[in-house]
């Protein structure tokens, strides 16, 4: 079970979290970029906006639109340190560990994959790094650890 699958029912029960949906334009963006690029963008956004011990503008740093990852952050309560504490038990006041970064990234990617469904009807750009990833045994979905490094 993925990180997201373990929380999906809780998000669905929240009036606020359950209202987020990807638009056709956002799905087309995911298809065009591919999951490797979306993963890299997600990690960059999390490292810059959430991972520091005291993120700038915490509580209002995640826009409601502009990138599918932003929408996914609101849908999965990974939008600010307060929501991360309340929903995922990731306490504020410390920089993310690599396990916490992986957990948050996988939570967001899980929601995006769930919302995106089958993207085969959308045009896509071939991933130049996919064959290199396969050759080095890099998986598309690394195992998900518990937040805070608890395995």
Label each region the model flagged.
Residues 1-46:
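Core of compact, soluble alpha-helical bundle domains
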Residues 57-77:
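Immediate flanking context of iron-sulfur cluster ligation sites
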Residues 116-151:
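Short flanking/linker segments adjacent to small metal-binding domains or redox-active Cys/His motifs
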Residues 98-127:
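Long, highly charged low-complexity segments enriched in Glu/Asp and Lys/Arg with interspersed Ser/Thr
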Residues 82-106:
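Iron-sulfur (Fe-S) cluster-binding segments and ferredoxin-like electron-carrier domains
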